[in-house]
Amino acid sequence: MARFLVVLKPGVPLAAAAMLEALQPVLEGLRAEIEHRTPAHLSAMIRGGGESQRMQLFADVQSKTDGKVLELVLLSREAMGTTAPQTREVFKLMLELIQQHVPSMPLTFRSDRDGPLPTGA
């Protein structure tokens, strides 16, 4: 199962709902369908070319000692042993969309570059 994680940290304190709302252009760019949403969490489905290429995106606002962060997890059934090429492409697109549309929340961690979990997780 493929799993990619990114952590975003707002430059100024934001409410959880505002952090999730800032993701709207990213969700639209990924053509993600929101399945469940609360003030601090959302889950969405991203459909590729069939059931085997279906991906899930989870966004969770987490309280840390130095403030709130937004964690985004992209999951698919694609095998990581094959480097999960389709999931990796969606992950790269997600990173581009975040950089383009969410500059107020800089990326502080990405699992493909920094390891499986953030330090202190």
Model-identified regions with their sequence ranges:
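Ser/Thr-rich, low-complexity intrinsically disordered terminal regions
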Residues: 1-121
